[in-house]
Amino acid sequence: FGALSPTMWEGLQMGVAYLNEELGMPVRMCTGEGGCPPRLLRSRFIKYVILQIASGYFGWDEIIHALPEMKEDPCAIEIKYGQGAKPGDGGLLMWYKVNSLIARVRGVPAGVSLPSPPTHQTKYSIEESVAKMIQSMYMAWGFRVPVYPKISATSTTNAVLNNLTRNPYAGGLAIDGEDGGTGAAYNVSMDHMGYPIASNIRDAYLNLTKIGKQNEIPLFAGGGIGKNGNLAANAAALIMLGASGVQIGKYAMQAAAGCLGSETDRCNVCNIGLCPKGITSQDPRLYRRLDPEKVAERLVDMYLSFDTELKKVVAPLGRSTSLPIGMSDALGIADKSAAERLQIQYVV
């Protein structure tokens, strides 16, 4: 909350609510770092929202104060430890975007840049982070709301996963690959750091199968799922590699709001609030260019198309009504090294 404009937030909320209420499509929206709009917290539509808590804890005073007034529980709590686009870095909201509302929700002065630490400062080990923080958040909602960590894809993913398998309160693990998006990061982080999501999610799933926990800890894959416009095909492949669900960000902004950024070129004004489309601006002169109803309509159209294409991919496998999680025998690739790395078929 703070990175996206009020009109973008409203459009996404409307679209997600329609997908769930009218179409019965299980799409959820994550707040990202920084809290949640106060009106949404006290709305019944909060049940379609995943509340994210990150190392800066921005916005969580507002959330805790709203707890007694919440009409519904949130869908889940996501504890962000890392982001695929910038492993090892914390979040950053530039001062250009910290207006009076953002400042009030985040509990900070207006017009001040808000960096988050690269780690959760109150925890000093993976064991504490996994066990104590997850348990604390789980207890806060009376053990009704699942809690899971989000990490950037790295070579230490399995170390985190092994700790989760011993934690009875862990609701899953979200892994964010190197192609994930961000509104503010160093170029060196975005261009030269990170780990591919496909091999990382595969390693995690195979690790779970070895210990018989593949049906207990769901894995969620993110980071470049919509790359090159192949959303359904990439999502299906990751599900067959072991993911129980996928997360998208950049693709939704491009499809629903006409984001000018692309895989080969960046607009480069997300972080300073001068987005010409009004997607990532807190300036009323810019965000009023964005019609939330049109954003909602296009978001619904995008997910309907995604659903149709995903069914076309999955139906020939005889799994038209359920996801083929870990069904890697349906995958093939013409790259022998990649086939060996992912333990899937090599086809020529």
Question: Where do the PLM segments sit?
Answer:
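N-terminal capping/small domains of soluble enzymes
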Residues: 1-121, 128, 297, 308-309, ...
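Short, well-ordered coil↔helix boundary/capping segments
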Residues: 293-304
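Glycine-rich phosphate/ribose-binding loops and adjacent secondary-structure elements
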Residues: 115-290, 294
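Structural signal for hydrophobic packing residues in well-ordered secondary-structure cores
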Residues: 13-29, 81, 133-142, 167-170, ...
